């Protein structure tokens, strides 16, 4: 696995371009119609490593971005530099720079809402959308004065529980917790909400993001005795190096813009994504709204949903845990576009 990973990395082309007020880093492999992939929290372009290889071999240009706040892409300090307009704008910059015309956009975790809204906002640039682990919810419209999403999440959690998205809100607090031991944090994140943690009996039920009030986020991240088969020590060290480069602040700032999302996307209320769409999730993944109710709502909200699949026993890190299944399904979806 280590040799294969190194060979794959050596075949990549790295790019750093200027646009949308920042430097944007992305990697490419292969030639053909482009598929632009957006990662989530707390990850890297590297989370798409298996799909990069599969796409290139199948005759596509795999394009994996380092999202704003991560890796070699700029990491502005200002919280409002991470709202959905900025995030979608970065993907638009990359799509335009490829100079291919409309491209396919894909996303996982936080990268999924970015991909969904990119497809909604710019159908002229994105001809199809494929997302993992976070189903499409669409614009909900501006909330009434005095009501915000953080308040609704706190109300749902109750007085005795915290919620990871709320824990991430206070600047400095979450950074101190997550950055105290980045290796331990990344090892815990990548294992605790994977399907392996439940399968191995290290947790008794899937983690839905809630935990006892007063505890730290890292207290919830059970760490394995041995890494799961889909994650090597080399993989883990790459993630640690990428996060060490920037710290967690940029990634956390995505969460600190949740309250702004309804108003920013309100002009698109009632609009639908009509391009061909694709969704895959894991049956044990409850961290980001991957519930049966959300899947059902998504199926009603997408105009041309061509693939919707929940992989039994899989957790949150779908394109790594189930690399071959995800790659095969994506290839079939892409082939259907031609």
What kind of region is each of these model predictions?
Residues 3-12, 70-106, 110-306:
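Flexible "cap/lid" subdomain of the alpha/beta-hydrolase fold that forms the substrate-access gate
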Residues 13-19:
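Short acidic-hydrophobic surface loop/beta-edge motif
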Residues 19-28:
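A short loop-to-beta-strand scaffold at the N-terminal edge of the catalytic core in hydrolase folds
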Residues 27-75, 94, 108:
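Conserved HGGG/HGGXW glycine-rich cap/lid loop of the alpha/beta-hydrolase fold
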Residues 30, 98-101, 337:
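Glycine-rich phosphate-binding loop signature in dinucleotide/nucleotide-binding domains
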Residues 49, 116-120, 327, 331:
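Short, hydrophobic alpha-helix immediately C-terminal to the catalytic nucleophile
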Residues 305-338:
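Catalytic active-site module of serine/aspartate enzymes centered on a nucleophile-bearing elbow/loop
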